[in-house]
Amino acid sequence: MELKKLMEHISITPDYRQAWKVVHKLSDILLLTICAVISGAEGWEDIEDFGETHLDFLKQYGDFENGIPVHDTIARVVSQGKIT
């Protein structure tokens, strides 16, 4: 699947977080996580490291306006598991 097609699907995923607390878009976090895991990331810190290393690439498909989220944020958002 092309990343642009993947982003079309990710971008319609509902975000149940409290809007006033959101710093990083859900679609950015999901794109980062998927790409990192496909590339061999095995934990939250690996995902963060992947993002820092590949930020220019990720920005071709996502906004990443506030950079890469820290691993605690990635873990918290992905672990919420309210994706339908």
Curated annotation (Swiss-Prot):
| InterPro entries recorded | Transposase_11-like, YbfD_N
What Pfam family is a match for this entry? DDE_Tnp_1_assoc
Q: Which organism is it from?
A: Escherichia coli (strain K12)
Please list the disulfide bridges: none
Q: What is this protein called?
A: Inactive transposase YbfQ
| Miscellaneous notes | Missing up to 300 C-terminal residues compared to orthologs.
